[in-house]
A protein has these predicted regions:
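Structured interface patches
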Residues: 1-194
């Protein structure tokens, strides 16, 4: 059975067929996104990395069609949604990003860019054929924040905000210094052991 996400075709062919892709796939299907997430998660301790995160579901709905009656401008409309693990750049702890991207794309070649019309976002195509998976993966990557952080009200302990507890084993080399300083001029009393 063919996978419409992986099959290459020209935007015009996909639009002529009225190709519709409505399915759930695993996050691991998107190689570049998975690589970026794995790199980010590598800074976490092993016990904080979510188990089986590559198997997280990604919901896809993508329909190809035409923007005009003259069939000059193929389009891709739909939505892609996924929960992607990340590292909070404030507390350096794990968090989950909710990526939900609505797509309304005009698939145009370099020679068609000047003629693009409508309320579609222009998606310039460099090759004669495309793979729907590549469009969806690029949309998810672009939806990821540059600096992922916990939202307001979420548990996020910024390093430096937490006060470390004092250990009984703490060595304080200057703790005795105050008792050795006497008088308003700050003259030091000689150590009697000398």
């Amino acid at each position: 059975m063919r996978n419409p996400l992986l099959d290459r075709g020209s935007p015009a062919e996909l639009a002529d067929r009225g190709q519709v892709i409505d399915k759930k796939v695993e996050l691991g299907t998107f190689a570049r996104l998975t690589e970026a997430v794995a790199t980010d998660l590598s800074s976490l301790a092993t016990e904080h990395i979510p188990q089986k995160w590559r198997q997280a579901p990604v919901a896809i709905r993508l329909a190809f069609g035409w923007a005009d009656d003259g069939r000059r401008f193929p389009t891709a409309e739909g939505r892609v949604a996924a929960h992607v693990p990340a590292v909070c750049q404030r507390c350096l702890g794990p968090l989950e990003l909710n990526l939900d991207v609505d797509l309304k794309l005009l698939l145009a070649g370099p020679d068609q860019v000047a003629h693009a019309t409508g309320d579609y976002e222009l998606w310039e195509i460099d090759e004669a054929t495309i793979r729907p998976l590549d469009i969806l993966e690029e949309a998810l990557i672009m939806a990821m924040p540059l600096s992922a952080m916990h939202g307001p009200g979420e548990s996020c302990d910024t390093p430096g905000e937490t006060v470390p507890t004092e250990s009984a084993d703490t060595v304080r080399p200057f703790a005795d210094l105050r008792s050795r300083i006497s008088g308003p001029a700050g003259d030091m009393e000689p150590d009697e052991s000398e």
